[in-house]
C-alpha cells in the first residue's frame, strides 16, 4: 500500500497549508495507514506528528529534507528515520543544518538507522555520493531514464489538502518573499493530498517494484521516546542528597532557626525531595540565585507554591519563612502527586541575558538551550498581510484592523461587527481576501523565543531533542510541551521589572541619602507603608495599581501585612463577593462562623472565610485525617472541578471524618463549603511572596517618594508623573542649558527629560547635553549641526519653553525661525558682528503654552493656568482631594473629556465629565436637566467652577453637578441709565442661562452691582434683546 512520505507541513513556514490535526483526519478519510512529514531542514513538528499519529492509529514516518554541498554541487536529500536510532540521528542532523554546520562528512557519520531518498528531479546519472540511496519517483517521472541499479521508491510532494488551496499557498509565498501576487511565481499543481487507493493502484500498474520497496521500507518503522527525567548533576564529585542537606542546615543556622519545629520540618522535606529524585534540582536553582546575588542583583522573595518550602527558604531561593507564616510544603511538592517541582526564577529584567550566559557557561552549550515558540497569523496580521497583497492602502488596512478586538477571531468579528462585515462585503476582492485570511489564521508564521523558558539536561540535548542556533545560546526546535514530555528539565527565568525597580531604588537611596537598605529585612508591618496601602495610594505598586485593587484597599484599609495578603486573594472573581463579609467580621459587625472548634485556628485569620487553597488542605488534614499529600489531591480535584474524583473524595472525606467522631451532616456541609471555596481560593504561598514584593516597593514610595518616582519615571513610564503631582510634587521649568536627558527629581521638583519629546532624535538630545551651555537662540542654532536644523526637531524645543531664558515670547521665536536659520547659515559666518533683526509678534496665552507642553511631553511644564486662576479667585472652592461624600461642594477644575449619552427611559441627553484640579481627577455627572442648561458652555480643556453633591460609587467619589460657571476673569458688563428697566433686563438675562457673571453699572447714581443669582451665555441674540434697555454692553 502507498505511504505518503514527502509532506511539507505548516512548520515549513509559509510553504505549506498542511496542519497536523487536519492531516491526521484527512489521511484516515483517504484510507492511509502510514503517513510522513518531510519539512525542510527542521523538525519543529516531529514530536507532535509522531504522537498525533500514534493517537490516531496511524503509522508515523519521520523525514527531513536537507540540501548539502558536495563536490561543488548542491544535492537535495530526503532522510527517513527507520527506527528510534534513526530518529536520534535526525535530531543531530537537523541541529547541524539549523546551526550552519552540516557537511557531508558529518552526515555520513550519522546515517545509521536512516534511509536516504534522492528525488528524481534532483538526480542525474552523474551523481556520485558516498552512501546508498533510493530514487524517489512520482507520477510524472520518466522511468526509462532511471538507473536500473538503483532502487526506486514512490515519492509525492504534498503541500496542501485540495487544489482549491493553491491560491492561498500562492498568497503565503508572496507574504514570505515580500512580493506582490503578480511578482510571485505560481504554485505547482498536483501537490494535494490524494486518495491512498488511487495512488496504490497507479504504482502497482506502472512501477510495482517501487511500491514494494516502499512497503519494505516502512514496514518496521517505530519510534520510542525516552521520557525518564534527565536532571543535570549539580556536582559529580559529591552526593546531591548530602550537599543539599549540608547547605540547608547551614542556611537555617545562619538565620538562627536551627531549632524545633524547623529541624523536623526540614528533615521531612529533605526526605520527600530525595525520594522523588529532586536533590539536584534544588541545588541548581540555589546555584542560579547565588550567581545573581553575587552580582548584586535583587532576586526577590520567590513566587508560587515554592514559598511553602523550608528547604527553599533555607537556601534563600525564597524570602518567606513558611513555618512562621503557616505555608504548606505539600502544596508545592508531595509524593502522592508526582510532578516536577516548579520554581520560577524571578530576576531583574535588565540582567536576564547575563543569566543565560551563566547557564550556558556553567552547564555547557550542549546541555542548555532556550525554548522555541511559534508566532502565528493572528486575525489582524492575517488581514494586514493578505489585503496588502490585494493593493489595499494603509489607511484602509488600519481602519479595518481597528475593528478587530483583542480576543476576536476573524469568524467572530465578522459575525458580531456590522461595520466590519459591511467593509468585507463591499467588494468582491475583499471577500476573496477575507476567505484567504481566514484560511491562514492560526498557522505558524515564524519562530520566536519563549519569554522565560530554559531547558537543561544531564547529557547532550541533541540526544533527545533538535536544536537551532540562537544569539545567547542554542534554541530548541521543540516547544515547551514537547521538551518536558521528553523528560527534560524546563526552568522559567522570568525577567521581572519590579525587581529592577526595587534594586534601582535601593541603589539610589544609598547614593542620595547614604543609607544602606536591606530589602529582605524591610519590616512587613511598617506603619507608614501600611498607611499607604490603606489609602489606596498604590499606583506603581506591583499587583495593586489597577483601579479594582485600589478600590478594594480603600474598603479593607489593611491594618497589618496579613490583610494585604488577603486583599490579593479577595481581588479575584468569586472571592471578591466576600469582601463585605470580611470587613464586617473584622470590625465585629457580623458573626464569624468557624463551623467546628477543631478547624477554628485555620479559619480565624480570615474571619471564617476560606480564602486560600491551603486552608482547604489543612481542614481536610485536621477534620478528616487526610495526609497533606492526599489533601492536595482533593484540592486539585476541587479546583479542576473533576466531578468523578470529587465524588470519590467526598465519600472518603465523610468516612474519615466519621471515624474521627465528626457528625456526618456537619462533615457533608463542610465538604460542600470547601468545594465552593476551592474553586476560586488563591495559593497562599504565592499571595504571600508577591505581597511581600509589593510591600517592598511601597516602602520606598512611603519613605523615599522622590526616589520612587525618579525610578518609576525613568525605568517604567513618565505616566507616573500624574501620581507624583497628586503627591505634591511639582513640574519645574527647565531651559536648554539645564534639561536632563532622563527625568530627574530633586527636592519635590520634577525635571522632565529630553527623552519625553516625541520625535526628537536621541543623538540630537545627547549633542545638546554635550555642547551646552548656549548663550542665545542664535548661538544654539549656529552651533546646531545641519542635519538637525529642521523645524520638526527645533519647534518642540521652542514650544516647551527651553529658550524662555533668552526670549520669553515663544511665538516670536517660532515665527522668526525660518529667518534665523537663513541668518545663521548664510549671514552669520560672513558678518560675525551683525545681529539678527527680530520681527515682533503676540505670544501664546498661558493656556496655549500649557496645552503645547502637554501635547509634546505629556505634561505641562510651566505654571498651570488653573493655579493662576485659583490664586486670583474670590470664590470659595474645595480641592478634589478634600471632598467628603454626601456633602455639597464647589470645585475649580479643567475638563479633560466629555462623554454624552442618551438615557434609556426618556432618550434625553446627559453627560459624564472627567475633570482635574491639577492634582487629582474626578468624575462628574450632569443629568438631562442640568446638561440642557449648560451644554453649550462645556468644552474640553476649559476651566470651570462646578457645584454639586458628592456621591460615592464603586468606592470612588464623584460629583452630581447642579451648576456650572466659567472660571474666567471676563464678565458681562451692562451700562444702564437707572433702575427703570430692571425687571425687563432680569427677565432677558434669565432666558440666556450660562456661566458668565453679570455686572450692572447704573450711570445716574454711579452704582455698580454684581448679580449673584444670574449667569449668562453671551450671544449676539442676547445683545439684541438687551439693546432697547441698556446704553452699552461689554464682555471683558
From Swiss-Prot:
Q: Which reaction does it catalyse?
A: DNA(n) + a 2'-deoxyribonucleoside 5'-triphosphate = DNA(n+1) + diphosphate
Look at the named UniProt entry and state the broad enzyme category this protein falls under. transferase
Q: Which GO terms describe its molecular function?
A: 3'-5' exonuclease activity; DNA-directed DNA polymerase activity; nucleic acid binding
EC nos: 2.7.7.7
- Can you tell which superkingdom this protein's organism belongs to? Bacteria
A single GO BP term for this record reads: DNA replication
UniProt entry keywords in alphabetical sequence: Cytoplasm, DNA replication, DNA-directed DNA polymerase, Nucleotidyltransferase, Transferase
Matching PANTHER family: DNA POLYMERASE III SUBUNIT ALPHA
Family statement drawn from the similarity comment of this UniProt entry:
Belongs to the DNA polymerase type-C family. DnaE subfamily.
What the protein does comes down to:
DNA polymerase III is a complex, multichain enzyme responsible for most of the replicative synthesis in bacteria. This DNA polymerase also exhibits 3' to 5' exonuclease activity. The alpha chain is the DNA polymerase.
- Assembly and oligomerization: DNA polymerase III contains a core (composed of alpha, epsilon and theta chains) that associates with a tau subunit. This core dimerizes to form the PolIII' complex. PolIII' associates with the gamma complex (composed of gamma, delta, delta', psi and chi chains) and with the beta chain to form the complete DNA polymerase III complex.
Name this polypeptide is given: DNA polymerase III subunit alpha
**Annotated organism of origin:** Streptococcus pyogenes serotype M18 (strain MGAS8232)
Its lineage reads: Bacteria, Bacillati, Bacillota, Bacilli, Lactobacillales
UniProt gene name: dnaE
